[in-house]
Amino acid sequence: MEQAPEDQGPQREPHNEWTLELLEELKREAVRHFPRPWLHGLGQHIYETYGDTWAGVEAIIRILQQLLFIHFRIGCQHSRIGIIQQRRARRNGASRS
């Protein structure tokens, strides 16, 4: 006979609330690294494409995550995880001038 699952602790936040909190965190971080007019244009593009829908929220989250990842990967001056340009140039044996 089937039984109800045991209580597994406190219930997690609703998915929608978590998604909106993630979007706010990404927006705060993006403003630190990219020009506001550029981010505004991105937001306008998403709104014109998706309207005021969850698909639009998911799209802008995905785009901001990708942009920030690439930005950090190529060596953001605010980041401790980025590649430092001089090291990369030496490692490849190339010099930039």
UniProtKB/Swiss-Prot annotation:
Miscellaneous comment text of the record: HIV-1 lineages are divided in three main groups, M (for Major), O (for Outlier), and N (for New, or Non-M, Non-O). The vast majority of strains found worldwide belong to the group M. Group O seems to be endemic to and largely confined to Cameroon and neighboring countries in West Central Africa, where these viruses represent a small minority of HIV-1 strains. The group N is represented by a limited number of isolates from Cameroonian persons. The group M is further subdivided in 9 clades or subtypes (A to D, F to H, J and K).
Name of the coding gene: vpr
Pfam families: VPR
Job description of the protein: During virus replication, may deplete host UNG protein, and incude G2-M cell cycle arrest. Acts by targeting specific host proteins for degradation by the 26S proteasome, through association with the cellular CUL4A-DDB1 E3 ligase complex by direct interaction with host VPRPB/DCAF-1. Cell cycle arrest reportedly occurs within hours of infection and is not blocked by antiviral agents, suggesting that it is initiated by the VPR carried into the virion. Additionally, VPR induces apoptosis in a cell cycle dependent manner suggesting that these two effects are mechanistically linked. During virus entry, plays a role in the transport of the viral pre-integration (PIC) complex to the host nucleus. This function is crucial for viral infection of non-dividing macrophages. May act directly at the nuclear pore complex, by binding nucleoporins phenylalanine-glycine (FG)-repeat regions.
Keyword Transport: yes
Chain segments carrying region Homooligomerization: 1-42
Record note on modification: Phosphorylated on several residues by host. These phosphorylations regulate VPR activity for the nuclear import of the HIV-1 pre-integration complex.
GO cellular component terms given for this protein: host cell; host cell nucleus; host extracellular space; virion component
GO biological process: DNA-templated transcription; monoatomic ion transmembrane transport; protein homooligomerization; regulation of DNA-templated transcription; symbiont entry into host cell; symbiont-mediated activation of host apoptosis; symbiont-mediated arrest of host cell cycle during G2/M transition; viral penetration into host nucleus
Protein name: Protein Vpr
Keywords: Activator, AIDS, Apoptosis, Cell cycle, Host G2/M cell cycle arrest by virus, Host nucleus, Host-virus interaction, Ion channel, Ion transport, Modulation of host cell cycle by virus, Phosphoprotein, Transcription, Transcription regulation, Transport, Viral penetration into host nucleus, Virion, Virus entry into host cell
Residues with PTM Phosphoserine: S79, S95, S97
Quaternary state and interactors: Homooligomer, may form homodimer. Interacts with p6-gag region of the Pr55 Gag precursor protein through a (Leu-X-X)4 motif near the C-terminus of the P6gag protein. Interacts with host UNG. May interact with host RAD23A/HHR23A. Interacts with host VPRBP/DCAF1, leading to hijack the CUL4A-RBX1-DDB1-DCAF1/VPRBP complex, mediating ubiquitination of host proteins such as TERT and ZGPAT and arrest of the cell cycle in G2 phase.
Cellular localization per UniProt: Virion; Host nucleus; Host extracellular space
Family of this protein: Belongs to the HIV-1 VPR protein family.
